[in-house]
Amino acid sequence: MFFSAALRARAAGLTAHWGRHVRNLHKTAKQNGAGGALFVHRDTPENNPDTPFDFTPENYKRIEAIVKNYPEGHKAAAVLPVLDLAQRQNGWLPISAMNKVAEVLQVPPMRVYEVATFYTMYNRKPVGKYHIQVCTTTPCMLRNSDSILEAIQKKLGIKVGETTPDKLFTLIEVECLGACVNAPMVQINDNYYEDLTAKDIEEIIDELKAGKIPKPGPRSGRFSCEPAGGLTSLTEPPKGPGFGVQAGL
C-alpha cells in the first residue's frame, strides 16, 4: 500500500515536471497559436472571406511556373507551394487567401483548407516580421533549450504565442526541426541558428532589430554538423575509380 502511494506520488511529480515537454498534436497547436490555435476557422474582423487579398502580378507569373511542374490537369498538386507563396506575400494566411488559392488552382476551397490546417508551417494568424520558433523537443531540451527560450522572453518582453507591440517578433515553441545534432537551435523565418547559448540568441535578436540578417548555421564555429573538433574521417579526397580492384578484373 505504502509502495503504491509513493510510486503514484513520484509519477505525479514527474508528470508535473515534464508535462510541458510531453505534447500531443492538439496541445501543440493550441499553444503555438500562430500556426493554428484551432483546426477550424471562425470569422473575425481581421480574418474573414471579405478580407482583401490578391496575388501580385509577379506572383501570378510564379504560380504559372509552379503549375507547369505538374502534369496537365493536376493543378491541385500545387496547393502547398502556392499557399506558401501567398503566405510569403502577405505574412500569414487569412481565409480569403486560401479561397484565392482555391480559385487560382480550380479546386474546392475545402481542399485548400485541409492543407492549411494540417501543416503548422502555415500561419493562420498574423505573425511578426521575424517568426522565432524555438525547438523544445527532447534533444534540444537536454541541451538546455529552456535557457534559450527564457533569454528570448526576457529580451523581447513577451511570452510564447505573443508578438511584440512593434509587430517585429513573434515567439512560439515547436516540435523537432530536424537539427538535433546541433542542439539547441531555433528557426527564424527560413533560417536555422544552431549550437546556441543565451548570449548567442540575444546577439541574433540585436542584429535583427538593427535590420541585419545574422549568418545562419552553427554558432560554435564548426562547419554544418561536423564534429566540434573537426573531421576525424573522410579527411582527404576519395580515391578514383578502380582503386583497390585487382588488375586482372
Curated annotation (Swiss-Prot):
Annotated [2Fe-2S] cluster binding sites: C135, C140, C176, C180
Localisation: Mitochondrion inner membrane
PROSITE patterns on file: COMPLEX1_24K
EC class name: translocase
Superkingdom in the source lineage: Eukaryota
UniProt GO MF annotations: 2 iron, 2 sulfur cluster binding; metal ion binding; NADH dehydrogenase (ubiquinone) activity
Cofactor: [2Fe-2S] cluster
Ranges where the record places region Disordered: 213-249
GO cellular component, one term: mitochondrial inner membrane
Family according to the record: Belongs to the complex I 24 kDa subunit family.
Name of the protein: NADH dehydrogenase [ubiquinone] flavoprotein 2, mitochondrial
